Amino acid sequence: MIGVCGFQWSLSFSTMYTVSLPHGPFLGSRAQEAFVGFSVLGLTLLFSKLFYNAYLHPLRKFPGPLLARLSRLYYSYYRSTGQLEWKTLELHKKYGSVVRIAPNELSFNAGTAWDDIYGHTTKRRSGRRLQKEAFFYLGAVAPNGEKNLGASSDEDHSRIRGVLSSAFSEKAVFAQEDLLMRHIGFMVERIRSLNGIPTDAVRWLHHCTFDITTDLSLGASAKTLACDEWSPLAHLMFEGIKEGITAVEILRFAPFKYQAFSLLIKAFGKARLEAFQAAINQAHIRMAQATTDKEDKKPDFMSYIIKANKTSKALTPSEITANVALLLDVGSETTASLLAGCLFYLTKTPHILEKLTSMIRKDFQTPQEINSKNLAQNSYLTAVLNEALRIYPPVAGATPRVTPPEGSQIDGRYVPGNISVAVNQVAMNRSPKNFTNPDQFVPGRWLGDGCFPDDQLQLCQPFSHGPRACQGRNLAWAEMRLIMGHLLWNFDVELSSESENWNSQKTWFIWDKPDLMIRFKSREGQ
């Protein structure tokens, strides 16, 4: 018996099951009958849906936990609480290379899944690539409603990517090296001024990459490296991503979810809106400069967009601001995450740190000699960064696609149509079936020295795979090499005791990084 507002509910379904009914002076028999009818109908529909999901659904033969097969609530709970990546890894260890992680979704972590899900059109009768799951990427849509490079259709993606391709070419990145060096040099001097006092490396790295990205994207640095504490603008980026993911998972179960998402972000997505507005303001200033300066020779990203606007590839003003905001989000957060992870694992493996530091200092007599071209010749540095990308991928989560109506072959299995499918980075990279001792930081696995001959190195795709793979990988590699090279040339680095378990982190698509306290001691003679 349950009491609500002074009334009792009672209805006998059988001699074994009793449910109370509302009764009172204002409720007649028809109201009681209607209430009972709707209750029975609702329960019948609910249990029918649960039974269908578990035993009649087209994915019924794919393994996975019962709760995940019954309801999407299982997936949404783990994702909205930052636990999905580790849970998915756990499920793959238990159930194998394909797991049903929601009633309508499969996770893969082996074989040809990368190419089958994210590759070109080689195995699909429709001749089309698998499309992004629209609602999952709703959080990536810019607050102005414009779909950016991350959330656009194939057609729009190709057009936008074409505009930005020149900006991310090796030639363009090489032309920007002086800009990168200016910000990296300033970070080194700021850290040197601390005289070896433990400091949060996450903040320094994030501020450095954020200043680089704002300078490259908007023609003006945000100057966050000058801050002694976290710059609110830089910190807003992660908070905005977290808010968007949480909103998406809450609204999966709501009617009119697309309309409700817009209202929810306006009401509670303060960080995301503030970050976006700041990007818009600076983008407008940069575009105005280009309009008044006929000889606009700044080699930043905006210059390439402005040049494209004089051709048939033109982007609308709202598309420009939406994509610039995305560049600020992704361009700074992901590179800083990787570098922080790399520093952590280096300091936890002193013999690797000592070897890499010695090699860099032997190769360069002065910091002026350090450049991305020379650093690219250091195969051990490349191996260290590749291992960091494997064990601590900047984008930790999955990016789901939807199978076409006729279904698709994925890793040798037929998957029915209209099913979400994905590769989870953590589950792929930490699988003992793919990598020997997957939780150990071992750069040697990338050097072909035979230490782990069974490793499936091709399964590590930190920049994703296929036509929608990360367009900024050339810039990312330049930043990673330059920042790591300059830090290790200038400083002896040591992990502070309070950060011993720094890698025990939750994820909201990207890592929720706590402070990484490191002592940067100037090397002797510096």
UniProtKB/Swiss-Prot annotation:
<keyword id="KW-0560">Oxidoreductase</keyword>
<dbReference type="InterPro" id="IPR050121">
    <property type="entry name" value="Cytochrome_P450_monoxygenase"/>
</dbReference>
<feature type="transmembrane region" description="Helical">
    <location>
        <begin position="34"/>
        <end position="56"/>
    </location>
</feature>
<dbReference type="GO" id="GO:0016705">
    <property type="term" value="F:oxidoreductase activity, acting on paired donors, with incorporation or reduction of molecular oxygen"/>
</dbReference>
<keyword id="KW-0812">Transmembrane</keyword>
<dbReference type="InterPro" id="IPR002401">
    <property type="entry name" value="Cyt_P450_E_grp-I"/>
</dbReference>
<keyword id="KW-0408">Iron</keyword>
<keyword id="KW-0472">Membrane</keyword>
<feature type="glycosylation site" description="N-linked (GlcNAc...) asparagine">
    <location>
        <position position="418"/>
    </location>
</feature>
<dbReference type="GO" id="GO:0016020">
    <property type="term" value="C:membrane"/>
</dbReference>
<protein>
    <recommendedName>
        <fullName>Fusicoccadiene 8-ol C-16-hydroxylase</fullName>
        <ecNumber>1.1.1.-</ecNumber>
    </recommendedName>
</protein>
<dbReference type="InterPro" id="IPR036396">
    <property type="entry name" value="Cyt_P450_sf"/>
</dbReference>
<comment type="function">
    <text>Cytochrome P450 monooxygenase; part of the 2 gene clusters that mediate the biosynthesis of fusicoccins, diterpene glucosides that display phytohormone-like activity and function as potent activators of plasma membrane H(+)-ATPases in plants by modifying 14-3-3 proteins and cause the plant disease constriction canker.</text>
</comment>
<dbReference type="GO" id="GO:0005506">
    <property type="term" value="F:iron ion binding"/>
</dbReference>
<feature type="glycosylation site" description="N-linked (GlcNAc...) asparagine">
    <location>
        <position position="309"/>
    </location>
</feature>
<keyword id="KW-0520">NAD</keyword>
<keyword id="KW-0479">Metal-binding</keyword>
<comment type="similarity">
    <text>Belongs to the cytochrome P450 family.</text>
</comment>
<dbReference type="Pfam" id="PF00067">
    <property type="entry name" value="p450"/>
</dbReference>
<keyword id="KW-1133">Transmembrane helix</keyword>
<keyword id="KW-0325">Glycoprotein</keyword>
<keyword id="KW-0503">Monooxygenase</keyword>
<comment type="pathway">
    <text>Mycotoxin biosynthesis.</text>
</comment>
<dbReference type="GO" id="GO:0020037">
    <property type="term" value="F:heme binding"/>
</dbReference>
<feature type="binding site" description="axial binding residue">
    <location>
        <position position="470"/>
    </location>
    <ligand>
        <name>heme</name>
    </ligand>
</feature>
<dbReference type="GO" id="GO:0004497">
    <property type="term" value="F:monooxygenase activity"/>
</dbReference>
<dbReference type="InterPro" id="IPR001128">
    <property type="entry name" value="Cyt_P450"/>
</dbReference>
<feature type="glycosylation site" description="N-linked (GlcNAc...) asparagine">
    <location>
        <position position="434"/>
    </location>
</feature>
<keyword id="KW-0349">Heme</keyword>
